[in-house]
Each structure stands twice: as C-alpha cells, then as structure tokens.
Curated annotation (Swiss-Prot):
GO MF entries: IgE binding; IgG binding
Protein name per its UniProtKB record: Allergen Asp fl 2
Protein source organism: Aspergillus flavus
Organism superkingdom: Eukaryota
Alphabetical keyword list: Allergen, IgE-binding protein, IgG-binding protein
Coiled coil: none
Amino acid sequence: FDKNQPWGVIRDLNVVNFKR
C-alpha cells in the first residue's frame, strides 16, 4: 500500500485481517 494514501493503509489492514 502507499504510505501517502491513508485509505490505502486502512484497506491493506482490512485485507490482511479478512484473509486472516
């Protein structure tokens, strides 16, 4: 994800949590 994009970080966390 891009650190410049806050929503990118949140989205990445959601994807990891979902896969987990």
